Amino acid sequence: MFPKINTIDPYISLRLFEVKPKYVGYSSVDARNQSFAIHDIKNYEKFSNAGLFYTSPTEITCYCCGMKFCNWLYEKHPLQVHGFWSRNCGFMRATLGIIGLKKMIDSYNDYYNNEVFVKHKNRVYTHKKLEDMGFSKPFMQFILANAFIPPYRKYIHKIILNDRYFTFKFAAHLLSFHKVNLDNQTTYCMTCGIEPIKKDENFCNACKTLNYKHYKTLNFSVKL
């Protein structure tokens, strides 16, 4: 289960709580249960207890902070995922408290760093795919070692514009958008992938005008 990029509130960390729920009609567990039940969804209690209600077959939403999640149907830990991506959600803080929420986020970090990372790292075809794209082995090793670990995960999520799934497709997109060659320490334009740029830049001069709307939101570079 992963958040939809356009529903991540960049300013939510500046607020202590979402004072008023965005979807008041789903404030009760019964209302959230009903949203799943009428669509014949099984084992939905874990989602409604996590403050989430059914929106569509590909999407569920938090009634309080309004964050939407996709690829959710087989998620085993919806409460942890919700807390991880929306840690200032009023529902999450009221349910777990600040200390409890921090402990849960730490444990979920461990889960991703161990189970999820190891599972994807063992996929040999991914190494081959990245190698076919023309990237050096040192850079592939760097990406495969850090793609699922903060702080690099937040960079990856900002880059992805089309694919929402948290798999090695993220690493592949990261490589294609922001090509960094560790052999000569050269960084290339995120748009054309051809023109070399400064370490603190993302686009070459020719592509900056094409990316004006996104330039500020994508104003970051992977720290090696």
From Swiss-Prot:
This is Inhibitor of apoptosis protein. Induction: Expressed in the late phase of the viral replicative cycle. Zn(2+) binds at C62, C65, H82, C89. It holds the Pfam family ASFV_p27. A zinc finger (C4-type) spans 189-207. One of its GO terms (molecular function) is zinc ion binding. GO terms for cellular component: host cell cytoplasm; virion component. It comes from the Viruses. Belongs to the asfivirus IAP family. PROSITE patterns: BIR_REPEAT_1 (PS01282), BIR_REPEAT_2 (PS50143). Keywords: Activation of host NF-kappa-B by virus, Host cytoplasm, Host-virus interaction, Inhibition of host caspases by virus, Late protein, Metal-binding, Modulation of host cell apoptosis by virus, Virion, Zinc, Zinc-finger. Prevent apoptosis of host cell by inhibiting caspase-3/CASP3 activation to promote the viral replication. Also induces the activation of host NF-kappaB. It comes from African swine fever virus (isolate Tick/South Africa/Pretoriuskop Pr4/1996). It is found in: Host cytoplasm; Virion. Interacts with subunit p17 of host CASP3. The keyword Nuclease does not apply. BIR repeats lie at residues 29-92. GO terms for biological process: symbiont-mediated activation of host NF-kappaB cascade; symbiont-mediated suppression of host apoptosis. The keyword Metal-binding applies. SMART domains: BIR.
